[in-house]
């Protein structure tokens, strides 16, 4: 076991805050319409250029263990904001740094950290209520486009394409993003489906940055029962390996030896594979698997009809252009099912809806109908170079997530204005002691930081702008950093999803509270000299089954 380095009190917190400052300084430059780009060296290929706060945060690891602990805590705030709301990562970073740094000064001055935290929690909950009150539902395509434009750093085309995609497949519809083979940026609606089952093992992940498994042009095996032993599947697995195409297995479950064997072969590169549980339960599960079979032009392997895994050939497997599997969902894009068969299945489901008397059954049938007939909108992002395409694709994905958040919880005035005006409600809060009051005042000051940073990135004085905005009673009155003018933010179309604002504040306060209440820090002591990794021999040939290992 490695020896540990232990630090206590203000020294530990101060070093953690140095790490927080390093990460926050790199991330904060991306905030707002005039935020700057950050260039990140990649382990291979061209450097990555991004204006996405969470991408910058994820790329940072510090050599000093204690500083790195602080940086990783701050990174967790940005990552959580991105996961929950898809945007607000830079705002979360700026807020967390302000709360942690000023909070630590108060602790050093003798304030009780637990009472400071209580004051902060009360203030944050009050601001969240103010954000909820200020929130306004969005309905029009124009408003959806505005959210997409803001979240993609002012790219109007991205906002308009997202709005068009939502119009095509509905606000709850499935929308995916992929790289185009040319310069254009298009929306295409294809046959596809999403269901709420994720990968059975994280070892199936192919894109570790986004933690998703991406299978291009895969075969799809649909098996009605549980898979616990792969022996009956060896002939079909061998055929898939020979074809050099990936395989998606959808079954009631894949467990024990079968799952372990698939994982081993996936890691060794013998078989590009992923496995997910089938959606639904009981008879409904079988019906949904039959829907997937029709959508992908495959067969549901069911023993009730005398079908056995040993006899399955490639002809029985479904096909799709692409499958993307996250921790919670599977999206099948452009299944190769026959249009006529899909239409017949849709009519069959519609007749079941008309016949059923159960509200529950009707709801579940309507869900199946929507999945089968709704299709998938694909946003195809093009550009002149690979670097440009990847950077724009990142922005499209962020904007899409933020737009979904806006549809879910509504929008508020953007540009940091909502948090700034909400902070004024904190001045009337009554608390038990001066330490809790200091916690409230800490939040009031920190809520000025996002708008200050937006303004400073645009080359103006943030403090002056904040002072002017606070003189106004209108809560939508703000500063348009793009045109350098004071405007009504809602009328000007400068809006943020309420969910993004809420999540950024919650995650920032959570991380800052952890830092100011930390008294002891334990990390691995750095080694005097690094031991070189022993050279490994080649993997050697994996006998049998074309490189597979069973």
From Swiss-Prot:
Binding site for ATP: 30-33, 51, 87-91, 415, 496
GO process terms (BP): protein refolding
Location of the protein in the cell: Cytoplasm
InterPro entries found in the cross-reference section: Chaperonin_Cpn60_CS, Cpn60/GroEL, Cpn60/GroEL/TCP-1, GroEL-like_apical_dom_sf, GROEL-like_equatorial_sf, TCP-1-like_intermed_sf
Catalytic activity: ATP + H2O + a folded polypeptide = ADP + phosphate + an unfolded polypeptide
Keyword Cell membrane recorded: no
CDD domains: GroEL
EC number: 5.6.1.7
GO molecular function, one term: ATP binding
Keyword field: ATP-binding, Chaperone, Cytoplasm, Isomerase, Nucleotide-binding
Principal location listed in the UniProt entry: cytoplasm
A Gene Ontology term for the protein's cellular component: cytoplasm
Residues annotated as transmembrane: none
Family membership noted in the UniProt record: Belongs to the chaperonin (HSP60) family.
Its biological purpose: Together with its co-chaperonin GroES, plays an essential role in assisting protein folding. The GroEL-GroES system forms a nano-cage that allows encapsulation of the non-native substrate proteins and provides a physical environment optimized to promote and accelerate protein folding.
Protein name: Chaperonin GroEL
Organism from which the protein derives: Rickettsia bellii (strain OSU 85-389)
Source lineage: Bacteria, Pseudomonadati, Pseudomonadota, Alphaproteobacteria, Rickettsiales
